[in-house]
Amino acid sequence: MQIIDGKQVASQVLEEVERDIARLREQGITPGLAVVLVGEDPASQVYVNSKVKKCAELGMNSRKIVLPSDASQEELLRIVRELNVDPSVHGILVQSPPPPHIDEAAVVLEIDPAKDVDGFHPENVAKLVLEDETGFVPCTPLGCMRLLKAAGIETAGANAVVIGRSMIVGKPMAHLLMSKQANATVTVAHSRTKNLPELCRSADIIVAAIGRPAFVTADFVKDGAVVVDVGINRVEDASAKRGYRIVGDVAYDEVAPKCRAITPVPGGVGPMTIAMLMANTVKACRQQTGA
């Protein structure tokens, strides 16, 4: 059984990104990422700070813009419009989820698709479906594909089941797996899917992205399957230092022995998300500057 080490693969991606940034800087170009946060959600603050820190480590410019939790929709849209026309900013990310009074879809629509390094704008969604590589793919599914490639997993002709149909992971993951580059046969499962364990047992590759701790158990998985666990769930644990531990959507201890390969949580898909965000930002910089 192979444990797919996301930290190691992310490190390789970031080394490539750092080399790309160094080459761009030799031409007088420094990629720039702007991250906008509305409110004081502690988890969002951690995510934003980790992105800003990673930019600095790689030699990339970053800008963190924090708005109060009662900031208006129009105020947020105004900032996005300013960033759209700022030539020093190549990637724009509005940290999700925003406060309830903010219309997230409207914010995504306001971001220039050329700077939408999250890959959520309808133009980039269309490019993913059309397999137009000038678009941006959401970072988590892009990272999952890189993990499969790094682990030497053959996707062509494989039966893949993606559990979850979100715009952030499930749907783009399905499109990536069925693309002409991957050539898998894909089933997307969700809360209304019948006989889910039986369906999953037919899969060579399972991608779990539903946000339910330890949902995928051993009876979902055939011997020799590959399991990619996208879930990041906090579970109360009095014995843990913080009072909780992080677990995935897969019951790792019982599923792993059956697998040909599996991603752990933490240390699997998680590190790939920020690595692919950095890669998307460099790609955006290149496309905008013609470098």
UniProtKB/Swiss-Prot annotation:
Entry EC no(s): 1.5.1.5, 3.5.4.9
GO biological process: L-histidine biosynthetic process; methionine biosynthetic process; purine nucleotide biosynthetic process; tetrahydrofolate interconversion
UniProt xrefs under InterPro entries: Aminoacid_DH-like_N_sf, NAD(P)-bd_dom_sf, THF_DH/CycHdrlase, THF_DH/CycHdrlase_cat_dom, THF_DH/CycHdrlase_CS, THF_DH/CycHdrlase_NAD-bd_dom
Matching Pfam families: THF_DHG_CYH, THF_DHG_CYH_C
Catalysed reaction, written as an equation: (6R)-5,10-methylene-5,6,7,8-tetrahydrofolate + NADP(+) = (6R)-5,10-methenyltetrahydrofolate + NADPH; (6R)-5,10-methenyltetrahydrofolate + H2O = (6R)-10-formyltetrahydrofolate + H(+)
Entry GO MF terms: methenyltetrahydrofolate cyclohydrolase activity; methylenetetrahydrofolate dehydrogenase (NADP+) activity
Keyword annotations of the record: Amino-acid biosynthesis, Histidine biosynthesis, Hydrolase, Methionine biosynthesis, Multifunctional enzyme, NADP, One-carbon metabolism, Oxidoreductase, Purine biosynthesis
Source species, domain of life: Bacteria
Known pathway: One-carbon metabolism; tetrahydrofolate interconversion
Binding site for NADP(+): G164, R165, S166, S191, I232
Entry keyword annotation includes NADP: yes
Entry GO CC: cytosol
Transport is among the record's keywords: no
HAMAP family linked: THF_DHG_CYH (MF_01576)
Quaternary data: Homodimer.
Homology family: Belongs to the tetrahydrofolate dehydrogenase/cyclohydrolase family.
Functional note: Catalyzes the oxidation of 5,10-methylenetetrahydrofolate to 5,10-methenyltetrahydrofolate and then the hydrolysis of 5,10-methenyltetrahydrofolate to 10-formyltetrahydrofolate.
Protein name (Swiss-Prot/TrEMBL): Bifunctional protein FolD
Organism, scientific name: Akkermansia muciniphila (strain ATCC BAA-835 / DSM 22959 / JCM 33894 / BCRC 81048 / CCUG 64013 / CIP 107961 / Muc)
Gene behind the chain: folD
